[in-house]
């Protein structure tokens, strides 16, 4: 899948905290969120120039430039200057934050979901809540978890740009060779564990499943659906304290530990990079991954299937790592209005189908199902595309975007890694991660 980044970008967030703080107090001229147009009235016919940092590589940038030109043609009073904004998507947060200080930030930019809270609390974003709540926008067609990511302290700072989710991908040949029935949409985690054990063949060096123990966010976010399905929480309601070390969190990690240590059915990847190629090659029977794998699955001609995640107590809840188009405030009612209008056009059913689906991503809206672009996309990336689209309904809550999540994720990843390699108990490791995360979360 040709997405700009999966599963989660966290590195850049550590380096820009001071810039964001400086931007909040620099007096650079941008007004607080939602202030544009408080007294003045937006004139949709006024000449306006807006800047859009897409955060995309060359192929995607060209596609988006074409859409901007199309909008310009239909709205000749609006000039949209489009560029990637930075050399890589990871660098965008640093660039935007520096722009807050110098007054050179854009009107619209791509942002990883992990940056949402930091940007939303900078004092430089628009609040477009009133706009997205208009009936014609059909805001609820976008998955709830993605909408929540774009909402900071009750303010809607933008519109989701990309949605995804984690599902179960299985290699049909490995199942056929072992004489094991394929996974079904109503599988429990006990079904998953039993199948993984049957599929593991030490003589042939085939594992039933895999898990990253690199300690990265790839390690961490795979635990969260199991925690949620058990009824647990990642953070306290105010986002200031860890809650993952609850009885539910311990039970979720103990389940994975049983597969890794007791069953020895789990390949432990030290790098994040090995388990997918091993799955393609038939050395791993099942992996937990997302629609970004569809391109490689097609390219490698893998015979595979996709189901929702297995469930605890019938709950197939999964997780998403949505990214966001963030709209910025320049204390200019016409710039704010034009930016909002363009953003709603860009993320409409008709236009998103020509962007995300054309680029191989999941559609942003449920209403895109059945469009010609959707039909082509589903056929091009069969059999996995439709199940991953359907799995969006199992995204019930957002992954945290609080500033301290980046640091917390590192400690949780280290805890999971230790437990799955037999170096600690789930309780001790998660308690230690919670303690280590306290300062980062209490900001």
Where are these regions (language model features)?
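Short, solvent-exposed loop/beta-turn-alpha elements that line the ligand-binding surface or hinge
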Residues: 40-43, 129-142, 185, 207-216, ...
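Extracytoplasmic/periplasmic substrate-recognition and gating elements
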Residues: 46, 73, 178, 258-263, ...
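Extracytoplasmic "Venus flytrap"/periplasmic binding protein-like
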Residues: 70-142, 177-179, 278, 285-286, ...
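Glycine-centered hinge/linker elements that transmit conformational signals in sensory
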Residues: 195-198, 238-268
């Amino acid at each position: 899948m040709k997405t700009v980044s999966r599963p989660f970008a966290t590195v850049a967030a550590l380096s820009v905290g001071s810039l964001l703080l400086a931007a909040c107090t620099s007096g650079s001229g941008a007004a607080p969120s939602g202030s544009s147009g408080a007294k003045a009235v937006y004139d949709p016919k006024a000449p306006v120039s807006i800047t859009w940092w897409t955060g995309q590589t060359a192929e995607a940038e060209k596609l988006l430039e074409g859409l901007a030109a199309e909008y310009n043609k239909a709205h000749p009073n609006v000039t949209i200057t489009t560029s990637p904004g930075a050399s890589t998507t990871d660098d965008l947060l640093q660039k935007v934050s520096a722009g807050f200080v110098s007054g050179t930030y854009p009107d619209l930019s791509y942002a990883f979901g992990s940056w949402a809270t930091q940007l939303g609390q900078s004092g430089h974003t628009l609040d477009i809540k009133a706009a997205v709540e208009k009936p014609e926008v059909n805001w609820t067609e976008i998955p709830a978890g993605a909408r929540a990511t774009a909402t900071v302290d009750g303010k809607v700072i933008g519109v989701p740009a990309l949605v995804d989710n984690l599902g179960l991908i299985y290699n049909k040949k490995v199942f056929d060779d072992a004489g094991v029935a394929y996974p079904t949409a109503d599988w429990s985690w006990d079904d998953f564990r039993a199948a993984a054990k049957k599929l593991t063949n030490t003589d042939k060096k085939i594992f039933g499943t895999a898990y990253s123990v690199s300690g990265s966010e790839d390690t961490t976010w795979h635990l969260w659906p199991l925690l949620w399905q058990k009824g647990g929480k990642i953070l306290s309601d105010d986002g200031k304290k860890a809650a993952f070390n609850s009885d539910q969190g311990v039970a979720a990690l103990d389940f994975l530990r049983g597969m890794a240590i007791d069953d020895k059915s789990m390949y432990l990847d030290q790098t994040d990079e090995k388990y997918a190629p091993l799955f393609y090659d038939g050395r791993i029977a099942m992996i937990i991954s997302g629609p970004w794998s569809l391109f490689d699955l097609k390219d490698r001609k893998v015979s595979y299937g996709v189901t929702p995640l297995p469930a605890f107590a019938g709950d197939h809840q999964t997780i998403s790592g949505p990214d966001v188009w963030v709209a910025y405030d320049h204390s200019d009612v016409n710039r704010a209005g034009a930016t909002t209008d363009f953003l709603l056009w860009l993320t409409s059913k008709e236009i998103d189908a020509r962007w995300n689906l054309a680029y191989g991503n999941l559609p942003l809206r449920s209403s895109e199902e059945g469009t010609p672009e959707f039909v082509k996309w589903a056929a091009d990336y069969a059999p996995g595309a439709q199940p991953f689209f359907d799995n969006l309904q199992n995204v019930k809550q957002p992954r945290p975007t609080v500033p301290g999540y980046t640091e917390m994720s590192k400690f949780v990843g280290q805890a999971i890694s230790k437990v799955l390699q037999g170096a600690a108990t789930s309780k001790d490791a998660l308690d230690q991660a919670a303690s280590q995360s306290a300062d980062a979360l209490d900001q």
